[in-house]
């Protein structure tokens, strides 16, 4: 309702994603989305991650990707996604990466804390950028990779740079602090 009032000339459909016929979604180059975060808590062993009541909405995004095959994806979720579920830490994120790989996407991701950009609260989010391997950007990503890609050429490199703490420990400790 708020979106419609602010953008009255935009065709907006607020249909439950579980009721959408994916074939009827218009062709698009970029799919931007997020999925509910409640099932990614690592504070409780009851959180079910990708198998939870709301966590399963990732699978709707994945189904849309399989049907529409957009060239690019930009997804967002809480940082807890990286360690979910608590009994198999990291499983859910690994599943998401594997799903995208299976659909021939290259993936770059970054955990971004709003406090690092002037906001008065710690609000860490994981952003996932994926592009088809057949795109110019995908080919470049697969060719370059490694530290150079993450620090200089990657999708997030300029706007969200990685701050290397120590040249002795290398980039691994900054990218994979867990």
Where are these regions (language model features)?
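Redox-cofactor binding/interface segments in oxidoreductases and associated redox assembly factors
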Residues: 15, 32-33, 75
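SAM cofactor-binding core of SAM-dependent methyltransferases
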Residues: 1-19
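Class I S-adenosyl-L-methionine
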Residues: 20-28, 38-178
